[in-house]
Amino acid sequence: MEKIVAVVICGLVALSAAGRSAAATNRDDLLRSASHLSGLPVRRVVPEEVLASPRYDGALLQATYREYPRLLRSIDTALYARLGLMPRSLQAQLVPDARVSRAWYDPAARRLLLRRTPTAQRTRVVNELVRALVDQNFNLRRITGLRVRDRDRALAARSIVDGTAALASGVTASPVQGPPLERFLQFESGLGPGKALAKELRYLGGSRALASALRLFPQTTEQLLHIDKFLERERALPVRLPTRIGDWKLSASETFGELDVRSLLRAFSVPNAVPTAAGWGGGRVGLYVSPTGQTTAVLALRWDTIDDAVEWRDAVTRYVGAAFPGATARDCPPLDRCWSSTWDVASGVLGTTSVFASGRASDTIAAALFTQK
């Protein structure tokens, strides 16, 4: 009997060892495949951890909150509401649904997280391993905290990393659908533009050209969207928002890039959104708060040419019609047009500068920005 037990134990140990060996072999094969497809060398083994769904979701959510803290989510919630991206009474769901993810590389911990069930497809695992290789060769921790400091730059950096991984693995973006806020956030993900830039760079200069984008990162989403802007390292035109306008105080301010403008127009199916946004030269969005706690959003943009600014002015009319249904238009010099709706809205273009405001006293605030030197 003791001999039988010993044989069974030995058999189980052998099977366990064989299972571990097979898993290690499969992991190594996937890493080699990621290296071959991306052209990035393997510097070290990528640690991995298989987690039950609750732990996996928790780890992903914690990482998201680390890069997108509560204060920033609160600012964006107020901003998106005043841009008409969601109903006034709705609390924005700005954090991605972790349940759709099955594999994810965490640059902070430098490990690959895998959901136990359902398991990730091979292409998704390879995609995350390519991101791990980008980290090994170019250090993704450089992006840590960037979203808090510079919205547009963070979008550009994240997009070229995700685009490089998608180009290698074959992962494609999901079809854009849903209400305006969901559409906006899907367009903002930047997977398509990042993949397109990675493909162009590889075509023009091979792996070395792509490596330059991963080493330096596009500084703006304009550079992400236009390879000539990236190669020239063209900087955004400066945009300043005053700290006070009358009794209203600037409470928050972020960069607002070409991808933001494009995504905002596309979220409402505004015609010619892409060519309109292409004239972007610089942008900033901010929230002004009154002494009584009311909040108004402002969007100040600079355009490359007067014609580009005129294109934006024409697009704004269609955007307001879609984002603020039933809005009543009125003249409000020196601005081009004001509207009354769920939010009071005001817009104006002067030369190559445009101002858009949404909220209480939007016409007064926009006019002050419109005429500032």
Residue ranges with predicted function:
Residues 184-295, 300:
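Pan-zinc metallopeptidase signature
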Residues 281, 292-373:
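C-terminal soluble interaction/assembly domains
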Residues 124, 128-136:
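Catalytic glutamate of the conserved HExxH
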Residues 112-126, 156:
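Short pre-active-site segment immediately N-terminal to the catalytic Zn-binding motif
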Residues 57-71, 89-109:
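Catalytic zinc-binding patch centered on the HExxH motif and its immediate surroundings
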Residues 22-74:
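N-terminal mature-domain "stem" immediately C-terminal to a signal peptide or N-terminal signal-anchor/transmembrane
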Residues 6-16:
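Bacterial N-terminal signal peptides
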Residues 30, 133-178:
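Post-HExxH zinc-binding segment in Zn-dependent metallohydrolases
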